[in-house]
Design a protein with these regions (language model features):
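Substrate-binding/catalytic subdomain of NAD(P)-dependent oxidoreductase enzymes
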Residues: 42-43, 51-164
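Intrinsically disordered, low-complexity boundary segments flanking structured domains
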Residues: 14-18, 126-127, 159-162, 172-173
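Catalytic, metal-anchored helix/loop core of enzyme active sites in primary metabolism
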Residues: 29, 37, 55, 140-189
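Rossmann-like NAD(P)H-binding beta-loop-alpha module
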Residues: 2-59, 73-74, 81
Length: 189
């Protein structure tokens, strides 16, 4: 069960241990898709968005159909698991989605997707240049706070714990009654 979220990191056991010791989970913030983290770490002036998706597929980080990863469904499923373990009632339909690929890219064939996805490259490159100038990175973040859940692409600066997340790593921050000022962080593959 532990391997369902965070690539086998001790996230679920940690949440259970905190709760059983009398603590309460107040907020969960996490990067839970190694595939999406890989993609957003690879985008550069030389490697456009569409190419990073292809690279993730070639290196077997992504599903054979990368639209599954890009849809955020896997991250939503993982967030729901964590929320339930933390004592919250949550269904996948309750999670607010802020996706970065238009809905119409998810319909049609995989071949259709590969033909359309390069049309996103210019917009991603324009924004990437701004982020680079502002010393920020993209991260696809799952969040649970005050019983509300969301997933979406966020821009994080160098002061954020997610900024230096490399490769296909996962990271989770647990804010609890005990770890309020300095959230507990679990990071790795």
């Amino acid at each position: 069960f532990e391997t369902n979220v965070g690539a086998g990191l001790p996230i679920i056991n940690t949440i259970n241990d905190l709760i059983h010791s009398g603590d309460k989970i107040l907020k969960i913030e996490a990067v839970l898709s190694g595939t999406l983290n890989y993609i957003f770490n690879k985008i550069s002036a030389d490697i456009p968005f569409s190419r990073t998706i292809r690279m993730a597929q070639e290196e077997r980080y992504s599903e054979p159909d990368p639209r599954i990863d890009l849809s955020g469904k896997d991250v939503i499923r993982k967030l729901v698991i964590l929320a339930r373990e933390a004592g919250y009632r949550l269904e996948q339909e309750d999670v607010e989605k802020h996706l970065f690929v238009p809905d119409d890219f998810f319909s049609g064939t995989l071949e259709d997707f590969w033909k359309k996805v390069p049309t996103l490259d210019a917009d991603f490159e324009e924004r990437r240049q701004v982020l680079e100038a502002e010393h920020k990175h993209w991260r696809f973040v799952a969040r649970l706070e005050n019983g509300k859940a969301s997933v979406g692409l966020q821009e994080v600066d160098a002061s954020h714990p997610f900024y230096n997340l490399e490769g296909s790593n996962n990271i989770i921050l647990l804010t609890t009654e005990r770890y309020r000022e300095y959230p507990m962080m679990i990071q790795g593959y």
